[in-house]
Structure formats: structure tokens, C-alpha cells
Amino acid sequence: MALETNTHRSYSIIPCFIFVELVIMAGTVLLSYYFECTDTFQVHIQGFFCQDGNLMKPYPGTEDESFISPLVLYCVLAATPTAIIFIGEVTTYFIKSTRENLIVQEKMILTGECCYLNPLFRRIIRFIGVFAFGLFATDIFVNAGQVVTGNLTPYFLTVCKPNYTASDCLIYHQFINSANICTGDPEVIEKARRSFPSKHAALSIYSALYATMYITSTIKTKSSRLAKPVLCLGTLCCAFLTGLNRVSEYRNHCVDVIGGFILGTAIALFLGLCVVHNFKGLYGAQCKPKPEDPRGVPLMAFPRVESPLETLSAQNHSSSMTEVT
């Protein structure tokens, strides 16, 4: 009887997951691949001034030479929230006090006539799957912004190596729109045209905020008041320092990092609040209190007015208690 109460039959969850969710996820990954690894989308050629001091910072080297290399960043971004969600869900499921609340929020799904989907399995797939989708979506938004704007990095003129003897650069305030004036490495120059928004800032704040929202909404610590805030603030601090590192190494402008923070924050909040509903169960949010039986409710209720006799008796009782003490 208890199994039937906590079981919900669904014939569409598996087909929807295979033919809708996985197809959307595959399309998102494929689009991200085209942005990252191909030249399908050409970067907008933005003009510049030959004597612009904001674009004359020293070349910091390739991305692999950065203090936070892309390989380390992507591994940490993907592994940290995944590990937190997996450990949190497994711990919540096997602790008796929290498992009862989980069973109320998440029902056992019966697909067809024989297959059961455990709430633990569904929550892990749901939360980690949405996180992975948001990670690729953030990467797409960042690449699209960089391709459309074509904002120049602080070291652009250093790698561009414009021909200062050309007629266009002889005039101090002449704005250059031609891409042929650069004499440096074309591959490095193209990367130097992708500054806004900062990819490191957007991905790091998205991952940190998603993990922070999961920790604050799911993990309960009754014995310690500071463990959860320290963990959340430490995660957000790492994302903040990642953005500052981009500015200190002259790889991005401050505006680029701020734009990346705003983009990553918006995507994390949207997915956390509107898609996974603040990491609450699907059925716990739909439970409504049972309406009160109207037969026992009076048609009209008036406020109770205390009579003078009751007031006098209460005063006499309090004075007698004072005399006794």
C-alpha cells in the first residue's frame, strides 16, 4: 500500500528523455563544438586607434601559460558541482531523517508495467544534466558574444604589430577599420579579437553559483551554522579570483570580466530557479494543504470581547497571588 502511494505511473518519461532531452543536449554540445573548434562563425573585425594605450599591454602568452589554464579550469568547473551533487544526493537518500522528506517530494516512477525509476537516480540525472546543459549554454553565449562584438584584448596592438609607417597610422587620431594593417600571427590576432565577455569569468561564476544554490537549498546542517556559508562563500570566492586573474594578466578588460559574471549569474539563476525549482522535488511543491471542512466553519465570526467581570476576577487573582508570594 505504501509503495502504491509513493508511486507515479508514467509512460512518457523514457521516450521524452531519449527523443527530446538527449537530442537537445546533443545539439547544444554540437553548437558549442562548432564555436570552439571550427571557423564556421567568423569574428567581427573591430577597428582601433594605432596609439590606443588600452590595447598596448604586453602579450601574456598563450592560454596554456596562464596561471589558470583552460584544462585546469574546465576540469574543476565540471568536477566540483558534479561531486557536490552526487555526494549530497547519496547522503540525503541514505540518511533516515532526510530520506522521509525526499520520498514525500519525489515519487517512485513506474514506466510501463515493470520498470521503476528510483528518486535518487532521477534527481542525480536531473540536477547534473541541467548543470551540464547550462555549462555548454554558457559557453555558446560567450562565444556568440565574442564573435558578434569582436572586442579587442588589452594586448591586441602588441600581437597585431601594425605598420606604423602606413598612411593610416601616421595620423594620431585616425580610426583603423582595415584588418590588413596587422603584420603579426593571424591565429594569435584572431584570438586577440575575442575579449568580451570573458569566458573564464562566465563559466566560473556559473559553476560556483549553481553549486552554491544546491548547497543552500538541499544540504541541512543543524549542528553547525558556519560550515555551509564558508563552503558557499569559498566557492564564489574562487570564481571571483578567476575573473581577477584575467585582468591581472592583461587577458581581459574589467568590463569583459563583469560582463562574464553577469552572463554566468543570469544563466545559473534561471536554471536553478525556473528549471530545477530551487532543487526541490516535483511533487513536494505541488502538495497543497487539505481544505478545511466548510460544515464546521461558522458563516460569520466576531472578535471576542472580554467582559468587565472577567477583567475584575483576573485582577483579583493576580493580587492574591502577589500577597501569597
From Swiss-Prot:
Q: Which InterPro entries match?
A: P_Acid_Pase_2/haloperoxi_sf, P_Acid_Pase_2/haloperoxidase, PA_PP_rel
GO BP annotations of the record are: nervous system development; phospholipid metabolic process
| Pfam families (alphabetical) | PAP2 (PF01569)
GO terms for CC?
Answer: neuron projection; plasma membrane
Q: Where in the cell is it found?
A: Cell membrane; Cell projection, Neuron projection
Recorded topology in the membrane = Multi-pass membrane protein
Entries under CDD domains matching the protein: PAP2_wunen (cd03384)
Keyword annotations? Cell membrane, Cell projection, Glycoprotein, Membrane, Transmembrane, Transmembrane helix
Sugar-bearing residue positions: N163, N316
For this protein, the parts annotated as crossing the membrane are: 11-31, 67-87, 127-147, 201-218, 230-247, 257-277
Domain of life of the source: Eukaryota
| UniProt-listed PANTHER family | LIPID PHOSPHATE PHOSPHATASE, PHOSPHOLIPID PHOSPHATASE-RELATED PROTEIN TYPE 1
User: What family is it from?
Assistant: Belongs to the PA-phosphatase related phosphoesterase family.
- What's the stated role of this polypeptide? May play a role in neurite outgrowth and neurogenesis.
Q: What is this protein called?
A: Phospholipid phosphatase-related protein type 1
Query: What is the originating organism of this protein?
Result: Xenopus tropicalis (Western clawed frog)
Name of the gene: plppr1
